[in-house]
Swiss-Prot record:
GO cellular component: cytosol
Pfam families: tRNA-synt_1c, tRNA-synt_1c_C, tRNA-synt_1c_C2
Lineage: Bacteria, Pseudomonadati, Pseudomonadota, Gammaproteobacteria, Alteromonadales
GO biological process, one term: glutaminyl-tRNA aminoacylation
PANTHER family per UniProt: GLUTAMATE--TRNA LIGASE, GLUTAMINE-TRNA LIGASE
Name this polypeptide is given: Glutamine--tRNA ligase
Coiled-coil ranges per UniProt: none
Top-level lineage group: Bacteria
């Protein structure tokens, strides 16, 4: 077992500790069982970190198992995307990838065993009749007229289902449990249905497919899972989980434990609603950096370490709560503050001309990549007579709180000299286009000899050697903390969730930027090169997160 002092603790780990101490289990085997019908989101990241993290900490194993029992909605592309997400988060699964479809023969055998024991029957009620017979939370169900069909006839009917002799929706195999149970999941649930659909793993071998609640527990048993961990919406289903395990001849007896799912402010987690965002072109794709998918966070510049830290901070409980977005943003902000190299980018450029700087002079300034981490080394930043600075970093007049460039006031250019503004040019609309200044050539890396110290520092890029870039300022997709509660969540989409800047200027070192690798743009925030640039050679940077939480003030 790894160092227990650094392990997180929660009620699930307490259960595992007790199971190991008592000898109930001699090792730990968990699993992460996504359905390959879409992209994983940050809620899945929590489950990945929990299941794989437990296996790591207890020197156990965690299986990656695809719950692929619904072929009409599944795709091999999602299988590949999910594998990429798990690996990106820093985890490896035990052995080969598992598929529920690997067990279709065994699952069919278990269904036959239930029929032979008089615990399953083929039912010909249609969907509407099935709902009517099922009852409600306040009204018990009633038995299907097909419930007492003989074992022999049910075996023959199930064989006909398997052989494709019934059309879809005509019949289904149901477990015979208790139609008066207070738990709806025990009112003779469907465990097999007819589907003439091509399967991405088994092809056209099967035309009957098992339901999730039947497949899940038996797959756990076949794989020797010791602790089957899922979210609270499956709490009642645990009774069906246990019933199935008790009724058939399985090689092991797993147990299910539930924890609260992740609810995150300003975010939707419903796959159906996320699909609506994509289908209605409210976002560009499933990996649009405003989406809560793992692929979107990766594209936005989030790091695996920040996601794992987030999962650690929010913990594992049975209590439903909503996590503030600031918790997630703090995790990535802290990670990148410590590890991201610095660079300079001017998003709204105006020209700065140093009038006393020689026309033919060009310098290669050596600038640290990180102010407190010498191991990150240095880079060369070109400097000459003409630079670009941010338009908001200059005013003709300003109060004492404004610590940037003002006429007759001095500031330091980051990593370079102290300059003093003298005058400016404006266009016909009165917008400043060019600022003129003088520089003190003795101030490279040091303060003026007269003892004065500039009160401000601004960033800049060389006007002649800077690179053109597109910068996408991503923000929260919704304007309200709980968009799912809105009558129409389209009405609460943040119109400023994406602001695209096409005229940005960046320092030349960023020509070597790699997709998804984040930089701190000095005084701006954290940005990474997009991983889906349509035009070869173009520089498109996505904002990962700002330097500080601007929403904290908005919400006050």
């Amino acid at each position: 077992m790894s160092d227990t002092e650094n392990r997180p603790t929660n009620f699930i780990r307490n259960i595992i500790d007790a199971d190991l101490d008592s000898g109930k289990h001699t090792g730990v085997q968990t699993r992460f069982p996504p359905e390959p019908n879409g992209f994983l989101h940050i809620g899945h990241a929590k489950a990945i970190c929990l299941n794989f993290g437990i296996a790591q900490d207890y020197n156990g194993l965690c299986n990656l198992r695809f719950d692929d029992t619904n072929p009409e909605k599944e795709d091999i592309d999602y299988v590949h995307a999910i594998q990429k997400d798990v690996k990106w988060l820093g985890f490896e699964w035990a052995g080969e990838i598992h598929y529920s479809s690997n067990y279709f023969d065994q699952l069919h055998g278990f269904a036959v065993e239930l029929i032979e024991k008089g615990l399953a029957y083929v039912c010909f009620l249609n969907a509407e009749e099935t709902r009517e017979y099922r009852g409600t939370l306040n009204k018990p169900g009633k038995n299907s007229p097909y419930r007492d069909t003989s074992v022999e006839e049910n075996l023959a009917l199930f064989a006909k289902m398997k052989n494709g002799e019934f059309e879809e929706g005509i019949c289904a195999l149901r477990a015979k449990i208790d139609m008066t149970s207070s738990f709806m999941c025990l009112r003779d649930p469907i465990i097999y249905r007819v589907r003439f659909a091509h399967h991405h793993q088994t092809g056209d071998k099967w035309c009957i497919y098992p339901m999730y609640d039947f497949t899940h527990c038996l797959s756990d048993a076949l794989e020797g899972i010791t602790h089957s961990i899922c979210t609270l919406e499956f709490q009642d289903n645990r009774r069906l989980y246990d019933w199935v395990i008790e009724q058939v001849s399985v090689p092991s007896t797993p147990h299910q434990y539930e924890f609260s799912r992740l609810n995150l402010e300003y975010t939707l987690m419903s796959k159906r609603k996320l699909n609506t965002l994509v289908e209605e072109k409210l976002v560009d794709s499933w990996d649009d950096p405003r989406m809560p998918t793992i692929a979107a966070f990766r594209r936005r510049g989030y790091t695996p370490a920040s996601m794992r830290e987030f999962a650690k901070r929010i913990g594992v409980t049975k209590m439903e709560n909503t996590i503030e977005m600031s918790v997630l943003e703090a995790c990535i902000r802290e990670d990148l503050n410590d590890n991201a190299p610095r660079a300079m980018a001017v998003l709204d450029p105006i020209k700065l001309v140093i009038e006393n700087y020689p026309e033919d002079k060009n310098e290669d300034l050596i600038v640290k990549n990180h102010p407190s981490d010498d191991e990150q080394g240095t880079r060369i930043v070109p400097f000459s007579k003409e630079l670009y600075i941010e338009a908001e970093d200059f005013r003709e007049e300003a109060n004492k709180k404004y610590k940037r460039l003002v006429i007759d006031k001095a500031v330091r250019l980051r990593g370079a000299y102290v300059v003093t503004a003298t005058r400016c040019d404006k266009d016909e609309q009165g917008n400043v286009t060019t600022v003129y200044c003088t520089y003190n050539e003795d101030t490279l890396g040091k303060n003026p000899t007269d003892g004065t110290k500039p009160k401000g520092v601004i960033h800049w890029v060389d006007a002649n050697k800077s690179l053109d870039a597109i910068v996408r300022l991503y923000d929260r997709l919704f304007t309200v903390p709980n968009p799912a509660a809105a009558d129409d969540f389209n009405s609460v989409i943040n119109p400023q969730s994406l602001v695209t800047i096409t005229g940005a200027k960046v320092e030349p070192s960023l020509a070597e930027a790699k997709p998804e690798f984040a930089y701190q743009f000095e005084r701006q925030g954290y940005f990474c090169l997009d991983n889906d640039i349509k035009e070869p050679g173009a520089l498109v940077f996505n904002r990962t997160v700002g330097l500080r939480d601007t929403w904290a003030k908005i919400s006050q």
